[in-house]
Amino acid sequence: MNDLMTKSFMSYVDLKKAAMKDLEAGGDGVELPEVGVTDERLKGFFQETEAVEEEMAAIRDALARLNAANEEGKSLHQPDALRALRGRVNADIIAVLRRARDIRARLEAMDRANAAQRRLSAGCREGTPLDRTRTALTAALRKKLKDLMLDFQALRQRIMSEYKDTVERRYYTLTGEVPEEEVIERIISEGRSEELLCAAVAEHGKGAVLATVHEIQDRHDAAREVERSLLELHQVFLDMAVVVESQGEQLDDIERHVNSATTYVQGGNKELRKAREHQRSSRKWLCIGIIILLLLVLLVIVPIATSFKRS
């Protein structure tokens, strides 16, 4: 499977270089060779592939910024700084969502174009090198997108896990007690940090700690907003992940077809060798039969001819 993908990407690079060379060298009234015609058919496909790659690169950059923002947020305590950071994070996530939807639309359009090429183009029938190249590249793009999905999912899980640890530390700082899991879950799920922590502070006779409580509330709002956006992004990726598996199965089928074709060719070569051996054997027995026939003729005709001469 990996070899097939590697060969397909090599074909992509080679075909694209050849296509650009043909386009630069070709002019009015100049007929391009057959390979150039094939590359011309792939020109739009290559351009679409590059556009998807650029969108993915932008998403990777946004992911790096989100990871950096998550680390930066650990050292921030002022509400204004936390809100500013939350604004940057939300802007990046909104941009990623927009790009992810655009990528999904582009990949769906590529799927439709691939299907149309199989129906309408004789050189792009199912299983042909051109069709395998288009299918493999489209599936490879989805595989990259799936890897990005896993990275964003890991970020979401890390943000919520770190937020949970922050709530636990702040609760311990205020009350001097390690909170039970149920208390932490209530603070996280219901967003009742101010009410719960104020009650805990009053119970233990500690002073006003509204700044800390407000910080936890701000972190809760930020974590919830980020989680909601990342879940929405995850759903977009998840919709495409189903197609990734389908494309993977198609590539496995293509690889099996290629292996089957190789087996058929090898089997055909064996049959040809057997046919040649059978032909040589038939000729040998034919020669032996002719020799035996000649000997029989000599053994029968010569005595008869001799007896006629004597009589």
From Swiss-Prot:
Is the Transferase keyword given for this protein? no
State the UniProt keywords alphabetically: Cell membrane, Cytoplasm, Membrane, Protein transport, Transmembrane, Transmembrane helix, Transport
Q: How does it sit in the membrane?
A: Single-pass type IV membrane protein
Q: Does the keyword Plastid apply?
A: no
Q: Identify the SMART domains for this entry.
A: SynN, t_SNARE
Biological process annotations from GO: exocytosis; intracellular protein transport; vesicle docking; vesicle fusion
Where is this gene product found?
Answer: Cell membrane; Cytoplasm
What residue stretches are annotated with the t-SNARE coiled-coil homology domain?
Answer: 213-275
Q: Give the family, as the similarity comment puts it.
A: Belongs to the syntaxin family.
- Protein name, as recorded: Syntaxin-111
* Name of the coding gene: SYP111
